Amino acid sequence: MTKLMVRSECMLRMVRRRPLRVQFCARWFSTKKNTAEAPRINPVGIQYLGESLQRQVFGSCGGKDEVEQSDKLMELSKKSLKDHGLWGKKTLITDPISFPLPPLQGRSLDEHFQKIGRFNSEPYKSFCEDKFTEMVARPAEWLRKPGWVKYVPGMAPVEVAYPDEELVVFDVETLYNVSDYPTLATALSSTAWYLWCSPFICGGDDPAALIPLNTLNKEQVIIGHNVAYDRARVLEEYNFRDSKAFFLDTQSLHIASFGLCSRQRPMFMKNNKKKEAEVESEVHPEISIEDYDDPWLNVSALNSLKDVAKFHCKIDLDKTDRDFFASTDKSTIIENFQKLVNYCATDVTATSQVFDEIFPVFLKKCPHPVSFAGLKSLSKCILPTKLNDWNDYLNSSESLYQQSKVQIESKIVQIIKDIVLLKDKPDFYLKDPWLSQLDWTTKPLRLTKKGVPAKCQKLPGFPEWYRQLFPSKDTVEPKITIKSRIIPILFKLSWENSPVIWSKESGWCFNVPHEQVETYKAKNYVLADSVSQEEEEIRTHNLGLQCTGVLFKVPHPNGPTFNCTNLLTKSYNHFFEKGVLKSESELAHQALQINSSGSYWMSARERIQSQFVVPSCKFPNEFQSLSAKSSLNNEKTNDLAIIIPKIVPMGTITRRAVENAWLTASNAKANRIGSELKTQVKAPPGYCFVGADVDSEELWIASLVGDSIFNVHGGTAIGWMCLEGTKNEGTDLHTKTAQILGCSRNEAKIFNYGRIYGAGAKFASQLLKRFNPSLTDEETKKIANKLYENTKGKTKRSKLFKKFWYGGSESILFNKLESIAEQETPKTPVLGCGITYSLMKKNLRANSFLPSRINWAIQSSGVDYLHLLCCSMEYIIKKYNLEARLCISIHDEIRFLVSEKDKYRAAMALQISNIWTRAMFCQQMGINELPQNCAFFSQVDIDSVIRKEVNMDCITPSNKTAIPHGEALDINQLLDKSNSKLGKPNLDIDSKVSQYAYNYREPVFEEYNKSYTPEFLKYFLAMQVQSDKRDVNRLEDEYLRECTSKEYARDGNTAEYSLLDYIKDVEKGKRTKVRIMGSNFLDGTKNAKADQRIRLPVNMPDYPTLHKIANDSAIPEKQLLENRRKKENRIDDENKKKLTRKKNTTPMERKYKRVYGGRKAFEAFYECANKPLDYTLETEKQFFNIPIDGVIDDVLNDKSNYKKKPSQARTASSSPIRKTAKAVHSKKLPARKSSTTNRNLVELERDITISREY
């Protein structure tokens, strides 16, 4: 393939030539590449899809020539790229890729995805919408019989094979200390109750039994709370053939609609404890405004069924009977059978009621059918494995781990034995900075009267620290582990080349000479407390030494308020690598290496060993193949097993999936025991895994949000770096960040993703400190600020607008993200999914959680990407009869289990799904173009196991045999495969899809656009790309002048209008303050009329701007206005009089004056909206809190009209005592007549009454 490296100037000339149009004659779904097309390149050098693919993907919406782009927009983009050293940099241009795609199901991508989303959602969505709300009566007594028993009210119980309704609510209970297999289960349908009992509690001895639900043959919805746990106990789910059941999780629905972010959870739990304490003490405080500082506390709940049922349905679940299932004796279940079945049935009832409340809310939050269809796909993951290999993996990893523990402990014991030999050499150990910290006092040998050693003596003659390592007199070897407190002393660890010292009050510390104290303070180290300092002085004094330094605390990963109590955890590994933490002992080095190798298994072993592995040998009738025509039940498959991962499909507020083992599994590392976990997922004979990693998924989404402002890919600096940046040229985002910070490229990735997820400069400073502890606070702050000034930009606090970013490579992006986060109802740009109620702006006051809301906008869009991809794949699999099903998705990775004969077709389906998904993102953000270099996966992996790269050997301490490599194909290699064509489609699928109606859905950004004027869009964009604040101020003035001049021109007035004219009109009341988020700028003028849907000329993107209405504090103060007028000599006589007029109110009127309008009144009104009456009355009481008794007292005591004394020259002294004395001895004014007093009192009472009515 020809590769041309061209500069942007050449590209501008190329785009003005119309690309060669080629008549497409290839047979449908042929994979022959069409190389006759010319590259299509945009004005900033980004290559777009070839004309053939462009026409197939975007239809009539796409294909606009780049010469039609606004010259002004391109000038601004060019300026931004130049300022960041990207304009003119080389870009990669390749031959256009061209091959036929399956036709879209509609005229646009949105119509296409709506229809296939409905196709994949039905009939399940209809089942949910038609779900019963009235529950049938529960039976008075349950029968303990193996299998299913159906209970219909008014009829005798009957044994059935499985529930036969289309929707059931389901719950399973297990004797989890005996077996992972189910013990009993209950289900509820619209007509009956069902109970399933394991043969184990009905006279059998083997607990290995699964629950039949006929999920292979019947389309049905099975509802449960954390239903993945229940699904793992369903018999038919242990098949390679795809299930027809939708296991719908109410926990996921709750989290997506009402969940809490990680920053909210601690506050929420603290508030819950406070409420529980008030209930227990029977304290019921009055409602106050302070109780509503965080309204989100009242619109969310934790995720357990007990908390969710309490929050949504006011149901108090008693979970005490759950403890019976912790028994190791099945007779406990048998003896309490009726009680425990009713306990399970109560959970079913609560789950049903919770679903009735949550499901309609979820559909409003996530209205696009793809969101529901994607949830169905992620709810049926399976992980095939081989039973013997799985057991070998567990045994090998555990054995090596235990061996490593023994090795570590043996080396520690050897160190101890070497040290204890020094017990008779005090001159040596007392001078050693580590050994001198040990207690060397000895207990002498006790002798009887006969001179024989007394019995039951514990190591007489040995030092106390050594004796404490022997718990009893029978202990032969010291009992010690790597976590023992004494280990850092024995290993002779040092921090910053200073021996570590233990303090009860401050944890591990280190000594710093007095002359270097300020240096270490500047490095952000924290002094140990005074008690620790005093203890160290006493210790050194007792040793006959002089204390020559000050103790500083070894930093803790969680911050300076925590004490470091263990220096050998994973958090301190990088300090060893950087030489900050060292050891003087060679044996200690070996022990640390052994400890490091076992760290992964030590942390993950319980989660891995608890996996529920179901082998085919126990259920020979299951494990059916993907094809209904063939079977896997033969001698080669007796070793097969399946793990159903306990995935919560929407386990976070960003709707990401959560699972504690597989979704957090690390990649295989040569020095980590058990790190080859993912390779234990193995395809059965005749099958393979086909999958891909989405390249920089969330970074691309974020950059696309910024590029959409210019309506061109690569228009912003971050967009250009994301698409064309390279390590060799130093133009990719991570390399540029690494250059600024002076760190590695991998470390720079952490800073970049943290910043895009909403983290601030403080986060960067703390992270820098962790990577390089030798940096001072001032240095880290300076470097972090430099990074954020280059990326996020500088801040502008306008007199008319709120704060915004300008001048950085990511300023436009962050202004846009903050704009989304600041909306009343933030939505993801593509599928329009709404944010959880706990993060909606109306529920946030004291805490804004802005970083969490920005993070939500990006990560939730990443979930939209996954749902679109899954939905598209399911459609293509059905349409072209591919033998494939989803295996697992790990954030930006996706893997399908595919028959060997269909592996290349499945790979092509993935590439097609990706181009549709990327194009959908672009179109919904207003760009009907797609860059060629991100349209396809960089490679599709075809492998026998799951691993990060197909060419990884996955050699670890627990796996000495290299795994055969797989196959990785890019789009061109895939097109060269003759068997990669999708083949003949199933026409019935398209006929079903076409039956679904399309409802036009206004793109989210277009919906936001209606709030902004074209003038603002034009000027605000120009302000963001400026690097000089003076240019930003100039553009602000021009913006006001242009907007108002247009208004004057419409009225026939040709006078020019400036910013100062605007300010005067605001003061005179002729104009209201400019409202940036208003329908248009001219709303401030009386009788002004303008079209809300007016668009910018020449394809200017109609886009929401980034900030809300400026509040009163953002408008210049009166004195500032006056100064500006004086400077311009534009103060007229009317304003002079206004500024110098005298106040006509009396002192008492001024004393009790209350303003009941303006911003404060509006805020009070807004706070009272949708609030309880008690809260409204309390707010009103505080708002109108005029001390009436004080007013009456002042009137009756003739304080209503005393005159102000003329000002006198101040004395030299300003003593507060003298001032107080003057106030005490001031003369009273003469008394007024009683008639005046009564009249004033009546008028004041009338005014107060009127004010309250207002």
Curated annotation (Swiss-Prot):
The keyword Nucleotidyltransferase applies. The keyword Nucleotidyltransferase applies. It comes from the Eukaryota. Residues 1219-1231 have a biased composition (Basic residues). Belongs to the DNA polymerase type-A family. One of its GO terms (molecular function) is DNA-directed DNA polymerase activity. Residues 1208-1217 have a biased composition (Polar residues). This is DNA polymerase gamma. One of its GO terms (cellular component) is gamma DNA polymerase complex. The gene is MIP1. Keywords: DNA replication, DNA-binding, DNA-directed DNA polymerase, Magnesium, Mitochondrion, Nucleotidyltransferase, Transferase. GO terms for biological process: cellular response to nitrogen starvation; mitochondrial DNA catabolic process; mitochondrial DNA replication; mitochondrial genome maintenance. It is found in: Mitochondrion. Residues 1125-1137 have a biased composition (Basic and acidic residues). In eukaryotes there are five DNA polymerases: alpha, beta, gamma, delta, and epsilon which are responsible for different reactions of DNA synthesis. Present with 377 molecules/cell in log phase SD medium. It catalyses: DNA(n) + a 2'-deoxyribonucleoside 5'-triphosphate = DNA(n+1) + diphosphate. Residues 1125-1145, 1202-1240 are annotated as: Disordered. Involved in the replication of mitochondrial DNA.
